[in-house]
Amino acid sequence: MDVENLIITTLKDKVEELTGNEMDIRLDEPPAINMGDYSTNISFRLAKDLKKAPKVIAEDIANSLNISGIEKIEAVNGYINFFMNYSDFSKETVSKIIDEKENFGKLEKRHEKVILEHTSANPNGPFHIGHGRNMVIGDSLKRILVASGYDVETQYYVNDMGRQEAIVVFGNEKFELDKSKKADHAIGEVYVETNKLLAENEELEQEILNLMKNYEEACEAGIENELTEKFKNAVDYSLGGFKETLSTLNIYHDKFVWESEFVKSGMVREVIKRLMDTGKVVEDEVFRLDLSDYGLEKKLVLARLNGTSLYSTRDIAYHINKMENCDFAVNLLGADHKLTAVMVNKTLALLGYNEAEVVFYEFISLPEGSMSTRRGRFISMDELFEEAKSRAAEEVRKRGVAESEEEIEEIAKKIAVGAVRYNIVRIAPEKPMVFRWDEALDFEKVGCPVIQYAHARCSRILENVEIISNDNLFAYEMNENEKTIVKLLSKLPKIVEKAAEVRKPQIVANYVLDVAQGFNKFYANCPVLKEENQIIKNSRIAIVNNTKMVLENTLDLLGIEMPGKM
């Protein structure tokens, strides 16, 4: 029984009965459960039409309603408050979670294909925490969209044709790769040293341009030669390191799509031709696409006069490929890419394609300052994770919950992944953020350890329960802590639906923290194993069991595992 929707439907019918008109109705949740479970202000909205005071209207409506699952309706100062029958509601919620287990929170299949592109960092050095924000938000959004019923394919767009990769290929001829280091870090060192070389000798820039031109010509001609092999090997080597980092954070892409694929297939050349045929291309040292019909003053650079393509052209070809293979596409991009993203989307519209949705994220930094890949001053995701794991291991040792160094390592890794992923995803992408250790590894208030610790508490309680009985559950007057946690648990499906609909994984992150905090209050105020009344004891054991399942299901949506012990 969906009590919230039942209230809304009943109120809509009542409004139509009173006015003859339909009204969009939204329910609020009072700040405290003793004030009701749901509340509406429709009396204020009806006052003008009915020519009555809101207080009178509220009392009339409250006295006339009879809603299944609602045991009391109160009119207070013009507001109408609804109180649920928690005995019935709790039985139904517990039964549903137990029946659905790991599927609780998942919605029906929608039969819509989504291509979600995220991370897509250039293969010229290790991921920094800016890339980390992209990958964590992207992977969390993928999991949420899948749970909400979409068929989702995640893609990583590999930039193998840009200047950065040409610098790596050039640098590999000048400097020896340090094979003792992780692949992407070794490539990053070559990239930094090569940039220093280029800064000292500007004449070398022509060699970089020649590499780019020769590689594109070989790709366009479908030729595989020594140069194409050098590019392929350099990119593959870096991607090997990338995949290690992604895997550590429980992130896996379905497909790695290389930029050069669209040059080799002739698609880039076809895109340029189609855009030339629109009559919107002007020649001005380069070929530029006029998008002023879409309100854009700046023109999109399509190609050089020598015919070689640019990143933007190849990006358009990639997006056309996406649009032809999905119902809708979602991209994760830094806020500094907003103009480029709009220009690509308007170009797609010009050619008759749907535009891609874009989730933009703002800058992320550490308290120590900002990052710069080119000069070699940045904090890599690998370093961030190792620091998180080291700090987590220290805390695990302090608490004395592990029996060996191997177990400390295993628990610390899961805490570290949770700390990094949760601390990033809980902040709205559009807000700049500073990654702070005291928040990421907070065991008391806002960190993922709070959630993982609540799960460990559930596990410890259930270890001492031989049989979980579902007989006569909640046949007593429940207290506020019990009501609050049961109501929170019931919300997961709607949370998933909302987060997927608005593409905001932080909704799930905030919800799971609410569940953990709600459970901690329940734990502190409601004895479970020591409760003497068997019906109350069984009901509370059911709450613990359900909380454990919901915490697992919800953190799985964020790519986070449970350590078990904390």
UniProtKB/Swiss-Prot annotation:
Instruction: List the SUPFAM superfamilies.
Output: Anticodon-binding domain of a subclass of class I aminoacyl-tRNA synthetases (SSF47323), Arginyl-tRNA synthetase (ArgRS), N-terminal 'additional' domain (SSF55190), Nucleotidylyl transferase (SSF52374)
An example of a GO molecular function for this protein is:
ATP binding
GO (cellular component) term, any one: cytoplasm
Q: Where in the cell is it found?
A: Cytoplasm
Q: Where is this motif: 'HIGH' region?
A: 121-131
Catalytic activity, per the record? tRNA(Arg) + L-arginine + ATP = L-arginyl-tRNA(Arg) + AMP + diphosphate
Gene3D superfamilies (alphabetical) = Arginyl tRNA synthetase N-terminal domain, HUPs, Isoleucyl-tRNA Synthetase, Domain 1
UniProt keyword Mitochondrion present: no
Name the PROSITE patterns on file.
Answer: AA_TRNA_LIGASE_I
Q: Which biological process annotations from GO are given for this protein?
A: arginyl-tRNA aminoacylation
Q: Which family does it belong to?
A: Belongs to the class-I aminoacyl-tRNA synthetase family.
Instruction: Tell me the PANTHER family matching this sequence.
Output: ARGININE--TRNA LIGASE, CYTOPLASMIC, ARGINYL-TRNA SYNTHETASE
Q: What is this protein called?
A: Arginine--tRNA ligase
Species: Methanococcus maripaludis (strain C7 / ATCC BAA-1331)
Q: What is the organism lineage in this UniProt record?
A: Archaea, Methanobacteriati, Methanobacteriota, Methanomada group, Methanococci
Gene behind this protein: argS
